[in-house]
Swiss-Prot record:
It comes from Arabidopsis thaliana. The gene is LCR10. It comes from the Eukaryota. Disulfide bonds join C30-C74, C42-C61, C47-C69, C51-C71. This is Defensin-like protein 144. Keywords: Antimicrobial, Disulfide bond, Fungicide, Plant defense, Secreted, Signal.
Length: 81
């Protein structure tokens, strides 16, 4: 009886860990920083072009220091109508 409980507990724990890890892998990293121009400023037009060329995704220029071009590559679910 004690061994069957231990086995069941081990199987359930392993299953839960596998589900959590696979969920993290599916989501993955959604944004990738890209270098900005030599003046250190992110130009939205250049950022958009670079991100579309490299990742086929969207882009955003962050404000503040450092000024970074972020490429957004996660697929978003479309709202259900």
């Amino acid at each position: 009886m004690k061994n069957s409980f231990r086995f069941s507990f081990t199987v359930i724990t392993t299953f839960i860990i596998c589900v959590l890890v696979s969920g993290a892998m599916v989501n993955g990293q959604c944004s990738f920083p890209q270098p900005v121009g030599p003046n250190g400023k992110c130009v939205p037009k250049d950022c958009k072009s670079l991100c579309h060329k490299k990742y086929k995704g969207g882009s955003i220029c962050t404000t503040g220091k450092p000024n970074i071009c972020m490429c957004l590559v996660c697929r978003r679910r479309s709202p259900e109508v």
